[in-house]
A protein has these predicted regions:
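Catalytic cores of secreted/periplasmic lytic hydrolases that degrade extracellular macromolecules
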Residues: 5
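Aromatic- and carboxylate-enriched substrate-binding clefts and catalytic-loop regions
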Residues: 8-166
């Protein structure tokens, strides 16, 4: 791109982590193997840093498509007013109906956000990139009506702290 006249380039890299679009919680900086794995990821980081290109790794701290170590889709998710796991469905653009073929996403309880951010930051040794972007924390705001109730204003405070920590 630089060879073709693009002078200012900034990368916001999405779906780069282990699980890709499956939305595993980013508790470590493990690259998706389908993108070349850790070796290629480190080489890309070095090349971008050498060329002075800022890179922001996108992190999703609100959505899970399945359980993972330490985060169960039954216990770590937010709960609806009916006390059932809060789920976000995907919709077909053509009909606005729920897409029954697409995986739905469980919404992580705001109470779990700080834990996930701390785990991620604890796993980072050398940060060879510019920073993080946390798109979903800026796009969604929801309550958790589970045992440990979290209202929207409390969720906003928790997410603001998470963004500050990142």
């Amino acid at each position: 791109l630089k060879d073709n006249g693009v002078e200012q380039l900034v990368f916001n890299y999405t779906s780069w982590g282990k699980g890709g679009t499956e939305n595993r919680l980013p508790t470590s900086l493990t690259a998706e193997s389908g993108l070349g794995g850790s070796g290629d990821f480190k080489r890309m980081l070095a090349a971008l840093q050498e060329q002075g290109v800022p890179l922001y790794l996108d992190l999703n701290f609100t959505d899970m498509t399945k359980s993972q170590w330490g985060y169960s889709t039954k216990r770590a998710t937010a709960h609806s007013v009916l006390r059932e796991p809060a789920i976000q469905y995907q919709y077909k653009m053509s009909t606005f109906q729920i897409d029954s073929t697409a995986k739905y996403r469980y919404l992580l309880s705001p109470n779990q956000t700080g834990k996930a951010v701390s785990q991620l930051l604890g796993s980072v040794k050398n940060r060879a990139f510019t920073g993080y972007s946390a798109n979903t924390l800026g796009q969604k705001l929801y309550s958790d009506f589970g045992e440990n109730f979290v209202g929207r204003s409390d969720a906003e405070t928790i997410w603001t702290q998470a963004l500050s920590d990142l």
